[in-house]
Amino acid sequence: MSVPLILTLLAGAATFIGAFLGVLGQKPSNRVLAFSLGFAAGIMLLISLMEMLPAALDTEGMSPVLGYGMFIIGLLGYFGLDRLLPHAHPQDLVQKRQQPLPGSIKRTAILLTLGISLHNFPEGIATFVTASSNLELGFGIALAVALHNIPEGLAVAGPVYAATGSKRTAIFWAGISGMAEILGGVLAWLILGSLVSPIVMAAIMAAVAGIMVALSVDELMPLAKEIDPNNNPSYGVLCGMSIMGLSLVILQTIGIG
């Protein structure tokens, strides 16, 4: 097994660390759940708007029309899917109930897993291809990816655990998001990385950024606010953004940002 593939596997596996942190101890309270949802929204917003979209637009040969167009397609695609899937909206979670509906929370967690997985898949390809061309650079990227995969695993496992009460189920769903990154690395390994077009990758990144922004503002943040009307969800958003920002600073400090 090649070193670049091993680095990609380790970076994706870091998601499980966050998953285990998300299920330790007692079943999360509503305040913890709201915080974790806000935390996830902060992660997604910062990654999408400060990392993925700018990187896509800066790709050589990528036109602003295509980049922003794919971003909008991602936004509209999410809202279209959201309309097709019947579900309870956030305000329904507190209507005539003091506790949120587990099914609604589980659905949100699944959508969160999908959004993070869509982000992690091209990220796995990028990690492998970069490490294949420059191993030292690959080590740095794998480290930064692993750092932000830990809170992503926590953000997925917390809501699933609260909805189901099952640690195995929570770890399973969190693991899926990490496996998506590993799958991306394996795919890049199978096609030797050279066939991955930078323009195609940039277009995918822009669309996924749109999906993640829509998921954050339409699903995660409103649901967190309904579960805990106090400031706790806002703290989660700020913490998520801060941790993601720190990982990006580390990335730039070691010279690969």
Swiss-Prot record:
GO MF terms held by the record: metal ion binding; zinc ion transmembrane transporter activity
Reactions accelerated catalytically: Zn(2+)(in) = Zn(2+)(out)
Membrane topology: Multi-pass membrane protein
Induction remark: Expressed at basal levels in rich medium. Expression increases under zinc limiting conditions.
Source superkingdom: Bacteria
GO biological process: zinc ion transmembrane transport
Residues reported to bind Zn(2+): E123, H148, E152
Sequence intervals crossing the membrane: 5-25, 32-52, 61-81, 109-129, 137-157, 171-191, 195-215, 236-256
GO cellular component: membrane; plasma membrane
Residues involved in Fe(2+) binding: N120, E123, N149, E152, E181
Keywords, ordered alphabetically: Cell inner membrane, Cell membrane, Ion transport, Iron, Membrane, Metal-binding, Transmembrane, Transmembrane helix, Transport, Zinc, Zinc transport
Subcellular location(s) per record: Cell inner membrane
Phenotype of null mutants: Mutant lacking this gene is impaired in its ability to grow in metal devoid environments. Mutant lacking znuABC and zupT exhibits a severe growth defect in zinc devoid media, is hypersensitive to oxidative stress and contains reduced levels of intracellular free zinc.
Alphabetical list of PANTHER family matching this protein: ZINC TRANSPORTER ZUPT (PTHR11040:SF205), ZINC/IRON TRANSPORTER (PTHR11040)
Similarity field: Belongs to the ZIP transporter (TC 2.A.5) family. ZupT subfamily.
Function summary: Mediates zinc uptake. May also transport other divalent cations. Contributes to zinc acquisition during infection and plays a role in the ability of S.typhimurium to colonize the host tissues.
Protein name: Zinc transporter ZupT
Organism whose genome encodes this protein: Salmonella typhimurium (strain LT2 / SGSC1412 / ATCC 700720)
Lineage, highest ranks first: Bacteria, Pseudomonadati, Pseudomonadota, Gammaproteobacteria, Enterobacterales
